[in-house]
Amino acid sequence: MTLQQEIIQALGAKPHINPEEEIRRSVDFLKAYLKTYPFLKSLVLGISGGQDSTLAGKLSQMAIAELREETGDNALQFIAVRLPYGAQADEQDCQDAIAFIQPDRVLTVNIKGAVLASEQALREAGIELSDFVRGNEKARERMKAQYSIAGMTHGVVVGTDHAAEAITGFFTKYGDGGTDINPLHRLNKRQGKQLLAALGCPEHLYKKVPTADLEDDRPSLPDEAALGVTYDNIDDYLEGKTLDSAIAKTIEGWYVKTEHKRRLPITVFDDFWKK
């Protein structure tokens, strides 16, 4: 088995999907989890206005609405969380995503004060954060807020990670990577677009340039610029297609060096890092 085949198998990626079937699969997955643990009453997700959170948010709201109808439990709710750092550049996209999702509840937590306070406390301890590390601080502060909300609402934190993100480790460890349940796992980027199109999402929300937008020095830096490959390259790789060897090596390089992000804390029984 080639490394490409191993990666595809590990991430559960498929070359072709039926969007309607995958929508149903994700919704049923979320419902089944909540049914298994009836003390859980909410799904909590940060909404950025980008493709991934818009899709995960819509699937979460659908799952909650169906489960509420089936069980008669009106305590069930989907909580969409706005998590801007100061003013958000693409605020209108975020509002459009909220309008499309129609969440039961919307909360806004501006993380800027918390991030700056943490940065100042570290500075007083003699640690000056780089812009890159500050970006990770933002991602972790956003996740901290979501878990606080989930803790107070008997909730589960929903993740937006998918195969095209997982393969490159393009997420912050214990930030946007630290979630409870990931309904998009297995899908590549273009497949996520297919699901949103099938759900009637406004096109501009899934055709916009993907960006983590974490760094102050490089605002709205496109994911593809940070990775050195395009999402089309990554999707083609995950679909088993043959790529230019340099591109394939770049993707595989990201996969190998970010393996630690796809695992729980390393123990004495783990040896993947020795390879």
From Swiss-Prot:
Chain positions recorded as deamido-NAD(+) binding sites? R140, K173, D180, H260, K261
User: What reaction gets catalysed by this protein?
Assistant: deamido-NAD(+) + NH4(+) + ATP = AMP + diphosphate + NAD(+) + H(+)
Q: Keywords of this protein's UniProt record, alphabetized?
A: ATP-binding, Ligase, Magnesium, Metal-binding, NAD, Nucleotide-binding
How it assembles, according to the record, is: Homodimer.
State its role: Catalyzes the ATP-dependent amidation of deamido-NAD to form NAD. Uses ammonia as a nitrogen source.
Family per similarity comment: Belongs to the NAD synthetase family.
**Per its record, how is this protein called by name?**
NH(3)-dependent NAD(+) synthetase
Report the source organism.
Salmonella agona (strain SL483)
